[in-house]
Amino acid sequence: MSLPVLSRIRPAVAALSCLVLLTGSVYAQALENLSIATQGGQRQTFRVEVARNDADRAQGLMFRRSMPADQGMLFDFGRVEPVSMWMQNTYLPLDMLFIRADGTIARIAANTEPLSTRTIPSGEPVLSVLELNAGTAAKLGIKPGDRVEHPLFKR
C-alpha cells in the first residue's frame, strides 16, 4: 500500500474508532441497586440503568444483543399515568414489570416478543416499568403485588 493511500485511510480509521467508543459509552450508564421483595419473603437484587428522560426512555434496550442476568432497565415516567411499551428494535425477549407509585408491581408482561410493534399496556396508571431478561420473573417467583425497592419509590 502506498503512502498516499495510508494517509487517506488513517483519518477514516480514527473517525471510525471514535464512533465505536462513543456508541459504546451510550450503554455505559451508571447502574443503580434495585431490590424486589416478594410476598413469599424472598429478596431479589438487580443492578439497573434508569431511563429518566424522553431520549433514554425512547432508546430503552433497543439494539442490545445481551444483558447480564442480574441487570435491567427501570423507566421513570416522572408521574403516575397509563403507559404502553413496545419491542421495536429490541432484540432481547423481556419481562416488563409495571410498577405503581408505592413500588408494588401492578402487572407483569412476561416473555415479550422481540422486534414486535404491538403495544403492551400497563393496565392501570403506573410510575415506572422495570425490564428484565425474559423468564426472570417466573424463575425468581416475582408476581404482581410484590414490592420494588428503589429511591424512585420514596418520593
Segments from the language model and where they lie:
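Extended hydrophobic/aromatic-rich secondary-structure runs
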Residues: 1-5, 25-28
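Bacterial N-terminal signal peptides that target proteins for export
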Residues: 2-15
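Bacterial N-terminal signal peptides
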Residues: 12-24
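Compact, glycine-rich, soluble single-domain proteins
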Residues: 28-155
